[in-house]
């Protein structure tokens, strides 16, 4: 029996969860599902420019696990861009770091689809 996946840590819930080619109705598009942790991996590595080891540490996963997450995310984004598909961000197995009103670090736990 495989062991259950560990939660990955992300900075925040995404503000935008749908992306699509302009001028094409959603009903006409195939869709790629990007998990919240895959989006976080893209943010850390490709937007922030961190090294994979730093990214893995921030998400509380091993380097090989981070490598699998980022590769999956990049493949999905490339598929959507090249083939004109919509991207929906949802689901995954992650925890969110949050600043609470009292000023200490808190977290929310989410399990996706």
UniProtKB/Swiss-Prot annotation:
Family: Belongs to the UPF0251 family.
Identification of the protein by name: UPF0251 protein Teth514_1147
Domain of life: Bacteria
Classification via Pfam families: DUF134 (PF02001)
């Amino acid at each position: 029996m495989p062991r259950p996946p560990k939660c990955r840590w992300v900075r925040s819930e995404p503000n935008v969860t749908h992306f699509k080619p302009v001028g094409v109705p959603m009903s006409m598009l195939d869709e790629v599902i990007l998990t919240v942790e895959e989006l976080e991996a893209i943010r850390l590595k490709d937007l922030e420019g961190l090294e994979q080891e730093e990214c893995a540490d921030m998400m509380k996963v091993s380097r090989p696990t981070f490598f699998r997450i980022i590769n999956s995310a990049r493949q999905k984004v490339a598929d959507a861009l090249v083939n004109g598909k919509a991207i929906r961000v949802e689901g995954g197995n992650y925890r969110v770091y949050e600043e609470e009103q009292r000023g200490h670090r808190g977290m929310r736990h989410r399990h996706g689809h």
